[in-house]
């Protein structure tokens, strides 16, 4: 089905926007904002904000997380995307786009509280990634249902990601120079 959709793409908007796509191809990308979004197939940042091609530099990962700054550690994909957006593309804004019903956050919640049947091996890439949630999980209240705690974790994970973002020196420098919000 992917090949079929690809073959019909030129007829579904490409032809009427050919000059814009030509401009993007020749001039390169100059996005105004970076969006760090969940890789959940239901979350489409360009559709949510009505963005055009070339407007956003988008990085997607499980649960829209930003790891702590750690040049000698793991998670270089997200860190490299942030560095590229800030230092090479000079984006003016970074948005962490959290969402409700996030399967990654739900999985992270059950992994953090060691819910039977939801555990991951220490060698799991998913577990290592979702360990970024630990500081947000540790702040959850003791009272409430699992569903309420997961909804709170969805919000707190964005806060932790923004705090982690502020630990990147090039992000701090761009903010201090009024080039980034």
Positions of predicted regions on the chain:
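Short beta-strand segments
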Residues: 36-38, 60, 95-99
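Conserved H-X4-D acyltransferase segment
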Residues: 28-46
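Catalytic core of membrane glycerolipid acyltransferases/transacylases, capturing the structured
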Residues: 41-65
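Divalent-metal-activated hydrolytic enzyme cores
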Residues: 1-31, 64-80, 84-92, 103-181
């Amino acid at each position: 089905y992917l090949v079929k959709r690809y073959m019909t793409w030129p007829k579904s908007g490409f032809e009427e926007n050919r000059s814009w796509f030509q401009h993007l191809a020749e001039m390169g990308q100059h996005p105004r904002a970076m969006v760090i979004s969940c890789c959940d197939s239901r979350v489409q940042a360009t559709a949510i904000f009505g963005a055009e091609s070339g407007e956003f530099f988008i990085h997607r990962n499980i649960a829209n997380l930003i790891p702590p700054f750690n040049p000698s550690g793991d998670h270089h994909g997200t860190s490299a995307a942030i560095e590229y957006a800030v230092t090479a593309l000079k984006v003016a804004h970074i948005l962490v786009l959290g969402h409700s019903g996030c399967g990654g956050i739900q999985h992270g919640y059950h992994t953090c509280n060691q819910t039977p049947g939801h555990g991951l091996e220490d060698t799991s890439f998913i577990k290592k990634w979702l360990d970024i949630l630990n500081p947000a999980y540790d702040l959850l209240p003791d009272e409430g249902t699992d569903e309420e705690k997961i909804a709170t974790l969805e919000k707190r994970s964005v806060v932790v990601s923004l705090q982690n973002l502020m630990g990147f020196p090039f992000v701090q420098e761009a903010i201090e120079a009024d080039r980034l919000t």
